[in-house]
Design a protein with these regions (language model features):
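Membrane-embedded helix bundles of polyisoprenyl
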Residues: 113-123, 129-209, 220-236
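Extracytoplasmic/lumenal acceptor-recognition loop(s) of multi-pass membrane glycoenzymes
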Residues: 388-389, 434-505
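Start-transfer (signal-anchor) and selected internal transmembrane alpha helices
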Residues: 1-31
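Transmembrane catalytic cores of multi-pass membrane glycosyltransferases
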Residues: 30-87, 152, 186-344, 348
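Loop-to-helix entry region of an early transmembrane alpha helix in multi-pass inner-membrane enzymes
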Residues: 82-86, 91-114
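Extracytoplasmic
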Residues: 383-454
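Signature aromatic-anchored transmembrane alpha helix within multi-pass, membrane-resident enzymes
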Residues: 364-394
């Protein structure tokens, strides 16, 4: 980071300062609005933020390998949450939710900018005269709408690659090894770096074959970073290698798409990307890349621009790999090798943000160096991409979703807790038309949940509750039986919808639940976002209605009478 401000290029210094100001501006809605901000719901408010709070208050943040969290599904394994060696869990331990969230966003985006800037200036676009490309591309990369709980899993790749390429080139600086040491403490191996290290390992092998020499220092750098991830992710490694109890992932089935569907998905992913690794590259970035390809073809510069060509090919291959991972032609292999279902190898496409933005910088460099008359176009593409990314700020994209305060509705659930009048650990609840993360965030002990893996026997027991509804609707039956990450009270009438606001006119008219298993599991109350007209037929009694001006929900509290 020190090097950023030691550059002798005054123009570059101004660009860097300007980039940090723009990053701060991008983060300003979180800073100014706090819990009144709009942020991503999917795989964020509906899960991770609640998990962090549950973990922080559970007393099991640093629990043993066999520890459980009683608040979720009568004892969700502690290992289902992130390791206590990951910095993000401590942010949520010591700070309020939105302070922790904002700090995490700031850390990730600043490191993303620094990493991409260092990578480009040292190994890709080395000319000081092109600093507007390196700084602009690094800024654009840092503003991408990444998956919040992914941390540096994708946005930290440029910094790690910078360090590893330095080591490959014989540079023994302590900064490289410090980078390889620290990044794993704010990233996830399964959400990016397993695939990154695998790719770098392949690159090392290619290097060794091409040069007919083993670069042992480079290999040791790769292995060292891998070892650091194994230490940080020790819970995950233990669960993967030593846990014998079947989990919900053992019923995960992914190979279902036809060849034609997979082919369409290839091009869709290539142009639009994926919601966990959003790059917003389909307009200005792709335009720059295709303009550079046309320039290369016209001037027959295939050899001199082979890095750019290789990145383009790899980018497309990764999109195809992602799409065809879900091709049903894999079925014979998945039946023979079960780990192909339980581990998501499609995530090699998580390398694409790194590849796309390095390609963007190279494309802009090719255009400028090809002809000075392209300079204006290059600046237009770069500024256009940055402006486009500002339009993808959460506060704009999710303006029609609940704010954090509205979503978790702490005042409403405090009133429900007071109304029930029992210690929360003495009874269990479940939700209908509402994410169970909301109840979990408010301290209720839930029989429903959204988690990556949990006991398969629990999934089967929970299924008994919703079996009559699953039989009515093949879509939700398949969703639950062949994935099951959302262990929810699914209903035929509501389908896969879990955010019914108080303005909704939706009612459940033909609900059919088997609540005897629910009671046997400790269930006493149902929190429903919609009224249930045939509650009595399901052995439920309306016990109260709760809402407030600060929430978007109206909670119908039903007591189970069996």
């Amino acid at each position: 980071m020190i090097r950023l401000f030691l550059t002798n290029n005054k123009h570059e210094q101004k660009l860097i300062v300007g980039a940090f100001i723009l990053i701060a501006l991008y983060l300003s809605p979180l800073i100014v609005l706090g819990e009144y901000a709009h942020i991503r719901v999917h795989d964020n408010l509906d899960s991770n933020l609640a998990w962090y709070k549950v973990l922080a208050t559970s007393g099991e943040l640093a629990g043993g390998l066999d520890a459980v969290t009683p608040q979720i599904i009568n004892g969700l394994p502690r290992n289902a949450f992130g390791s206590e060696l990951t910095l993000i869990v401590w942010l949520y331990k010591f700070f309020p939710t939105m302070v922790a969230y904002t700090l995490s966003q700031a850390i990730t985006r600043v490191v993303a900018f620094i990493g991409m800037y260092l990578l480009l200036t040292k190994h890709v676009v080395k000319k000081p005269a092109l600093s507007f490309i390196t700084v602009g591309t690094a800024l654009a990369f840092a503003l991408t709408p990444f998956w919040p709980s992914g941390m540096l899993s994708t946005l930290g790749m440029p910094l790690a690659l910078w360090a590893l390429l330095n080591i490959r080139n014989g540079e023994r600086s302590w900064k490289n090894y410090l980078t390889l040491t620290l990044v794993p403490f704010y990233a996830s191996i399964v959400l990016g770096f397993f695939f990154f290290l695998a790719a770098i390992g392949i690159f090392w092998l290619y290097d060794a074959i091409k040069k007919k020499a083993l670069n042992i220092t480079f290999l040791l750098g790769i292995l060292y970073m891998g070892l650091m991830f194994l230490i940080v992710e020790y819970r995950l490694i233990y669960s993967f290698l030593f846990e014998q109890e079947p989990t919900s992932r053992d019923e995960y089935f992914h190979a279902r798409l036809t060849f034609a569907h997979s082919l369409r998905l290839t091009f869709k992913n290539f142009v639009l990307g994926h919601n966990h690794v959003m790059t917003v590259h389909g307009l200005f970035v792709l335009a720059a890349i295709f303009l550079a390809l046309i320039f290369i073809a016209k001037n027959k510069e295939w050899h001199s621009q082979r890095l750019f060509i290789w990145l383009f090919v790899i980018n497309f291959i990764l999109s195809a790999w992602y799409a065809f991972w879900f091709y049903r032609g894999w079925l014979p292999l998945t039946e023979r090798f079960h780990f192909l279902d339980t581990f998501n190898f499609a995530r090699f496409h998580f390398l694409r943000p790194l590849i796309i933005y390095v390609s963007f910088a190279l494309a802009l460099k090719i255009l400028v160096e090809g002809s000075l008359k392209w300079t204006g176009t290059v600046k237009f593409l770069l500024i256009g991409q940055i402006m486009l990314l500002f339009l993808f700020n959460d506060e704009i994209i999710y303006h029609d979703k609940p704010t954090v305060k509205e979503f978790y509705a702490e005042d409403v659930f405090a009133e429900i807790k007071y109304h029930i009048g029992l210690p929360q650990e003495d009874y269990r609840v479940a939700s209908i038309g509402l994410h169970p993360a909301i109840s979990q965030y408010n301290g209720f002990y839930t029989l429903d949940t959204y988690n990556n893996f949990y006991s398969l026997s629990y999934k089967h027991n929970f299924r008994k509750i919703i079996e009559p509804e699953l039989e009515k609707n093949n879509k939700i039956r398949t969703y639950f039986d062949e994935w099951g990450g959302r262990c929810y009270i699914f209903t035929d009438e509501l389908g896969k919808h879990y955010m019914f606001k108080k303005t909704s006119n939706k009612k459940l008219k033909n609900l059919d639940l088997n609540l005897e298993p629910f009671v046997e599991m400790g269930g006493r109350y149902i929190f429903s976002a919609v009224p249930i007209e045939n509650a009595a037929e399901n052995h439920m009694q309306l016990d109260g209605e709760f809402t407030s001006k600060d929430t978007v929900w109206k909670i119908y509290l039903y007591k189970v009478i069996i």
